UniProtKB/Swiss-Prot annotation:
PANTHER family: COL_CUTICLE_N DOMAIN-CONTAINING PROTEIN-RELATED, COLLAGEN ALPHA
Full protein name: Collagen alpha-2(I) chain
Entry function: Type I collagen is a member of group I collagen (fibrillar forming collagen).
PTM-bearing positions, type 4-hydroxyproline: P7, P10, P21, P27, P313, P316
Family designation: Belongs to the fibrillar collagen family.
Pfam families according to UniProt: Collagen
GO biological process: extracellular matrix organization
InterPro entries named among the record's database cross-references: Collagen, Collagen_superfamily
Keywords: Extinct organism protein, Extracellular matrix, Glycoprotein, Hydroxylation, Secreted
Tissue expression remark: Expressed in bones.
Membrane-traversing stretches: none
Amino acid sequence: FDFSFLPQPPQEGLMGPRGPPGASGAPGPQGFQGPAGEPGEPGQTGPAGARGPGPPGKAGEGVVGPQGARGFPGTPGLPGFKGEPGAPGENGTPGQTGARGLPGERGRVGAPGPAGSRGSDGSVGPVGPAGPIGSAGPPGFPGAPGPKGELGPVGNTGPGPAGPRGEQGLPGVSGPVGPPGNPGANGLTGAKGAAGLPGVAGAPGLPGPRTGARGLVGEPGPAGSKGESGGKGEPGSAGPQGPPGSSGEEGKRGPSGESGSTGPTGPPGLRGGPGSRGLPGADGRAGVIGPAGARGASGPAGVRGPSGDTGRPGEPGLMGARGLPGSPGNVGPAGKEGPAGLPGIDGRPGPIGPAGARGEAGNIGFPGPKGPAGDPGKGEKGHAGLAGNRGAPGPDGNNGAQGPPGLQGVQGG
C-alpha cells in the first residue's frame, strides 16, 4: 500500500532559523497522533534589553533546510462510515431468452454392481387340492376252509318204507360281523397343485430414521429406459428474476432444432437512468416450472466459463415398495409305499349250506386313508436376480442461497 498521503513524523534535520508564521491553511483531515519527539536543548538566556517598546522588527526570511529522511510508514486509517443505501434502481427490460444448449454426451455405462446377498426364504405355498382317489387294491385271499363236521349216529331203520325227501331247510342265520380288515396301502401322491395367485403388493414402508452414516457413492448404474412422455402441463406463473448464472460449459453442435414461433412484439420500454446500487435483496422463491418450449436454432458456441460450485449431495430417497412374494418351491418326491398289512383273523365257521350259484363281482372297496406328506424338496435355492434398470434421473435441484455480501474495502488514496 502507498501511505505517502498520510502525515509523516518529524525527522531529525538541521535546525534552521525560525521563520515567520505562514498563512493559515485549510483544515486538513485529523491524522493519527505521531510518536513523541525528542526533547530539545534548553535555550541560553540572553542579555536583558532596554525597557520600553522597541521598533517593530523586520520580517525575517526563512531558509529552506535540507530534506529530512523518509519517515516510517504510518498506520492505516480507520475505515470510513458506510453510506446510506441508495434508492432502488428501476428494473430494466428483460433480455431475450438465449438458445437452448446442446445436449451433453451420453454417460458411460457403469460396471455391474456386486452380487446381492441371499434373500430370505419364501413363504410356504398354499396347500394343493386333494389328489384323485387311488385305484382299487388287489382282491383279498380266499379264507381257509372250515373244519369238516362230525357225522351223526346212524338211526335205526324203521319198519315202514322210507319217507319222501324233506324240503330244503331255511338258510342259516348270518354270523356276527367280523373285525375290520387291516388298512389298505397308502394311496399315490396327488397331482401338483396349481400355483396360487400372486400376493397383493404391500403398502410402501415408512422411511427409516436417518441415523446411519452417509454411505459411499456407488458406481453409476446402467442407463435407465426412457420414460413415457408426460402430458403437457399448464403454463406456470412467471417467477421473479433470478441472479445471472455462471456461464455454462461449451456444448457440442447438435442437429438443428425446429424453429420456434415468433412471439408478439412488446412495447419498447423507457430507458431509465442508472440508479445507485442497493442492498442485495433476499432470495426469491423458485417459480413454477413452465412447459418445455420448442427447440430453437443452435446459437454460436459461447466462451467456456469457470466451473460452478459443487452442489450438496441429495438426501437419501424413500424406501421402495415391498417386492412380490417368491414363487413356491418344487413339490418333493412321493413318499415310499408302506408295507402290506397283516391278513385278518379267520372268522368262525358257519353251517355248511348248499353250494349256490356264483355271485357277481363285489363293489370296489373304499379308498384307504391318505398317506403322510412327502419330505420337502431338497433342491438348492436359485441365484439372486440381476440388478434392475437404472431409474429415471431426478429433477434438478434448486439454486443455493446467495452468500452474504463481502466486507467493504479500504478507500484508496
